[in-house]
């Protein structure tokens, strides 16, 4: 899976790193292990390196160049002493062809580069993808041969020899190229910027590789969850298909019942329609006979009405002539009566005018008499009021005189003064008389 990630990243073989190797021991992994939590990978943190450095001194350049040349020689020796087996060569050849094919059509061969690492249970599960590979001609034949060779060897031995040797060769070639470029740069400009750039690029590739591993783990989990969802969806689909089949069978039964019912209804409707047509035909024949008789009656009635119409027309003409004569008579009489009534109306108008003048004179006389009567009444009212006033004044004067006379007598004023000698003898009588007078006044 590591090489698949590198090949998917479209990186050249020179930048593949060699710090992570794959070793498979024991039985192939199961789905339980894939569902577990992925193991944490130690990430080497490389400090930031400046892009440019100051040129080195000549002794340093010579010393470093000697060390690097010695390293290059050792790597070359390692290339010649490394054992290369047949399986390794064939795997490298197949890998190079797979890379070329993936460069042209990456989507059609997603599993070709990982076939040497896929265990047998996983290969059987991904069997539907193999027809896409076999149709590619000669490569498919070689692929099958290589697959047979791989499956004949133990899993640990095959994967370790092939993958490890390939990685060692790639790393050795990469280090040789980097060291050669560094030696050349030291000899030219006394700097080693190419080495720093290679390290920086390798660090970026390494981080990218870790990202690819994380995405691959996430993809595996998503695939497992999607497989579970697919199983659930298949179960639901099968249940739905079963229910739909039952529903279809029920509908078929209903359709058969409806067909039988419709056949019975069609027969009944056909018989009913034939009977209705026969009855309607009889009714139409009977109605036609009645209409013929009615037409004959109407023809005879029309002839009779035409004769009657002629007689009525002659009668109406005679009556019209009589009415015209009577109309002329009445018009003459109307003129005479109108003239006579007009004369009477004129006489009545003259009489009305004379009566109106007489009535106006009478109204004027009546108004004058009314005025005289009103004035007489007013005068009588005044005289009555005056008489009443005089009587009241007379009564008031009499009362006033009586009151004054009594006052003079009581107080002995004027001619009513009594002599002194008679006062003593007649004291008692005087008192009695005074009381009587007072009583009389009160009365």
Curated annotation (Swiss-Prot):
Residues 431-443 have a biased composition (Basic residues). GO terms for biological process: cilium organization; sperm axoneme assembly; spermatid development. The keyword Cytoplasm applies. InterPro entries: IQ_motif_EF-hand-BS, IQCG. It is found in: Cytoplasm; Cell projection, Cilium, Flagellum; Cell projection, Cilium; Cytoplasm, Cytoskeleton. GO terms for molecular function: calmodulin binding; Hsp70 protein binding. Residues 393-422 form the IQ domain. Residues 415-430 have a biased composition (Basic and acidic residues). Keywords: Calmodulin-binding, Cell projection, Cilium, Cytoplasm, Cytoskeleton, Differentiation, Flagellum, Spermatogenesis. Residues 1-34, 415-443 are annotated as: Disordered. Pfam families: IQ. Its main location: cytoplasm. It comes from the Eukaryota. Component of the nexin-dynein regulatory complex (N-DRC). Interacts (via IQ domain) with CALM when calcium levels are low. Does not interact with CALM in the presence of Ca(2+). Interacts with the HSP70 proteins HSPA1L and HSPA8. May form a complex with CAMK4 and HSP70. Belongs to the DRC9 family. Component of the nexin-dynein regulatory complex (N-DRC), a key regulator of ciliary/flagellar motility which maintains the alignment and integrity of the distal axoneme and regulates microtubule sliding in motile axonemes. Binds calmodulin when cellular Ca(2+) levels are low and thereby contributes to the regulation of calcium and calmodulin-dependent protein kinase IV (CAMK4) activity; contributes to the regulation of CAMK4 signaling cascades. Required for normal axoneme assembly in sperm flagella, normal sperm tail formation and for male fertility. The IQ domain mediates interaction with calmodulin when cellular Ca(2+) levels are low. This is Dynein regulatory complex protein 9. It comes from Homo sapiens (Human).
């Amino acid at each position: 899976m590591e090489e698949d990630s590198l090949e998917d990243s479209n990186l050249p073989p020179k930048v593949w790193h060699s710090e992570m190797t794959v070793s498979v021991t024991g039985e192939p992994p199961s789905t339980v292990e894939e569902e577990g939590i992925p193991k944490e990978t130690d990430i080497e943190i490389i400090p930031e390196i400046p892009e440019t450095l100051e040129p080195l001194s000549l002794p340093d350049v010579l010393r470093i160049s000697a060390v690097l040349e010695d390293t290059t020689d050792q790597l070359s020796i390692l290339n010649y002493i490394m054992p290369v087996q047949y399986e390794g060569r064939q795997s490298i050849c197949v890998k190079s062809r797979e890379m070329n094919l993936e460069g042209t059509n990456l989507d059609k061969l997603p599993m070709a580069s990982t076939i040497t690492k896929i265990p047998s249970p996983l290969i059987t599960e991904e069997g539907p993808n193999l027809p896409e590979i076999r149709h590619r001609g000669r490569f498919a034949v070689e692929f099958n041969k290589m697959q047979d060779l791989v499956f004949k060897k133990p899993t640990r031995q095959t994967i370790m020899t092939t993958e490890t040797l390939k990685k060692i060769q790639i790393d050795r070639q990469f280090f040789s190229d980097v060291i050669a470029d560094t030696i050349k740069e030291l000899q030219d400009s006394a700097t080693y910027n190419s080495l720093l750039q290679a390290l920086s690029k390798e660090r970026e590739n390494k981080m990218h590789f870790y990202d690819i591993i994380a995405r691959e783990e996430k993809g595996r989990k998503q695939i497992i969850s999607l497989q579970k969802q697919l199983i659930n969806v298949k179960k639901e689909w099968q249940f739905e298909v079963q229910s739909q089949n039952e529903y279809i069978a029920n509908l078929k039964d209903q359709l058969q019942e409806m067909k039988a019912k419709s056949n019975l209804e069609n027969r009944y409707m056909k018989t009913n329609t034939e009977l209705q047509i026969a009855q309607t035909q009889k009714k139409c024949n009977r109605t036609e006979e009645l209409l013929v008789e009615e037409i004959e009656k109407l023809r005879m009635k029309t002839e009779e009405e035409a004769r009657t119409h002629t007689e009525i027309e002659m009668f109406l003409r005679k009556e019209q002539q009589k009415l015209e004569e009577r109309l002329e008579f009445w018009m003459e009489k109307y003129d005479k009566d109108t003239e006579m009534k007009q004369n009477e109306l004129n006489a009545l108008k003259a009489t009305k005018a004379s009566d109106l003048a007489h009535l106006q004179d009478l109204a004027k006389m009546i108004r004058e008499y009314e005025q005289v009567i009103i004035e007489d009444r007013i005068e009588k009212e005044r005289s009555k009021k005056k008489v009443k006033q005089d009587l009241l004044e007379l009564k008031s004067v009499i009362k006033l005189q009586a009151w004054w006379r009594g006052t003079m007598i009581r107080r002995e004023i004027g001619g009513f003064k009594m002599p002194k000698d008679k006062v003593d003898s007649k004291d008692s009588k005087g008192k009695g008389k005074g009381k009587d007078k007072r009583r009389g006044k009160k009365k």
